[in-house]
């Protein structure tokens, strides 16, 4: 046999030991095989004929040789031990949100054995990488909409927040810490727009760096504005000078503190700003073990507390998020596991 061949194992007749032996061969075998059961023409035991058995005549009169005869062969689903083991590994990877590992294992199985769930795992693997182009393409194939926030201008923020949550659940605390700053800046900016009516881009200039468009505060656009007066006054009180460079969460918090009267919102922003400043440099510039206790000791909050504050801040933005949206990865996992059970 070569890789293009499939072995057909007929378990319709023979002693019980012979049939069991063929089933064991299929279960333990590492080669492509199918277990075949052939029903009798009348659907029950054949009449036993031991004498005067004219093979040639019976073959000539065999109705199965007629065109259009019913196919009495039926494949018996009998997964190999290898398939069973690999699918259990796939399930374990999915339950810990390691979709690329699950996809790699799925690809080691024959394509016909994973047709029910392979595309869903691929969809999940691209989703966690924020590869929305391929996620959208795969949704067309799977017909499973995994993105609760559909707007292209808003979903990137929410999906990014979900990946932060996944890093926390997986105990990847260094990556969890490093991923906080981008979402904090984006959330603060969206909050400033929704709660205070201030659009940061109105006070910035665009520039290109390393082939990508960036932005920085524009001294010219800030001059003579209330926004400019607030940030300049804040730094002057500390004996410093506001430098109109990149936009940081600190700047956005200063503006929110001045223009918003919501004390709870300002406390949330204060907490996250302190978390960001107290621990991000530790993870970025030192070789150090970071645990949940490390985070608590340096910030006063466990990872789950930080994630809870990020979730709460979304409620101050213009992105409409239901509580169940935060469980969308678990819902996606249930869908994949369900499809694996429906093979």
Predicted regions and their residues:
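Long, low-complexity, Lys/Arg-enriched
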Residues: 1-8, 15-343
């Amino acid at each position: 046999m070569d890789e293009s061949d499939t072995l057909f194992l007929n378990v319709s007749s023979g002693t019980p030991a012979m049939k069991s032996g063929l089933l064991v061969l299929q279960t333990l075998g590492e080669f492509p095989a199918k277990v075949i059961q052939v029903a009798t023409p009348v659907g029950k035991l054949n009449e036993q004929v031991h004498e005067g058995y004219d093979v040639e005549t019976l073959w000539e009169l065999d109705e199965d040789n007629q065109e259009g005869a019913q196919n009495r062969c039926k494949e018996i689903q009998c997964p190999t031990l290898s398939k069973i083991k690999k699918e259990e590994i796939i399930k374990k990877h999915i339950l810990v949100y390691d979709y690329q590992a699950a996809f790699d294992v799925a690809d080691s199985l024959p394509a016909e054995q994973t047709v029910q769930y392979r595309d869903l795992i691929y969809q999940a693997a691209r989703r966690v990488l924020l590869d929305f182009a391929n996620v959208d393409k795969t949704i067309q194939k799977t017909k499973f909409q995994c993105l609760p926030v559909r707007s292209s201008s808003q979903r990137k923020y929410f999906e990014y927040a979900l990946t932060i949550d996944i890093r926390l659940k997986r105990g990847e605390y260094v990556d969890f810490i490093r991923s906080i700053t981008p979402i904090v800046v984006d959330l603060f900016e969206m909050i400033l727009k929704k709660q205070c009516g201030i659009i940061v881009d109105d006070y910035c200039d665009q520039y290109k760096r390393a082939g990508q468009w960036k932005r920085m505060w524009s001294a010219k656009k800030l001059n003579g504005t209330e926004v400019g007066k607030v940030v300049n006054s804040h730094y002057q009180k500390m004996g410093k000078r506001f430098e109109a460079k990149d936009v940081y969460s600190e700047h956005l918090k200063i503006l929110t503190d001045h223009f918003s009267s919501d004390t709870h919102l300002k406390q949330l922003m204060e907490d996250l700003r302190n978390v960001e400043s107290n621990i991000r440099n530790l993870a970025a510039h030192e070789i150090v073990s970071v645990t949940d206790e490390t985070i608590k000791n340096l910030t006063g909050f466990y990872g789950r507390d930080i994630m809870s504050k990020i979730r709460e801040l979304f409620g101050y933005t213009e992105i409409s998020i239901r509580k169940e949206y935060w469980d969308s990865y678990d819902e996606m996992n249930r869908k994949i596991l369900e499809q694996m059970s429906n093979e």
